[in-house]
Amino acid sequence: NHHEHEHEHEHEHEHEHEHEHSNEEQTCSEQNPIINRTHLSSVASTVGWICWNGLNFDAELVSKWLSNLSQLPGVIRTKAVLRTNEGWWSFNFVDRKEELRPNGYRRDSRIEVIIEGKDVPDVQSLEQELQTCLV
């Protein structure tokens, strides 16, 4: 019986995962402008945010922030597509290499930090830093 329960739980989890994408599109709004999506795994974890597209990031500040993040111990890379005061930009920081490119319009801004193992930085304080990058 215990085994069955586990199986059901796994199934539910997979089910949620499949539909995660459509759910998260609706939850980003003026009332709830920044949503955290953290996924922990022993191999590599991701800490990410989805930001309502009414938010405008300061391109220079957010670029510095992402660059600093990418150099934290354990961080493999940071990437983002953000609406900035200079239009939509995609950012990619890995091994001190930076790629910044103009990007087309998106429904929302997204940030993803990829980290080795489960030892992730404090998500709440990162989110506060992120908010200081808003215009």
Give, region by region, the residue ranges found by the protein language model:
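C-terminal accessory "lid"/substrate-recognition subdomains
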Residues: 1-109, 118-135
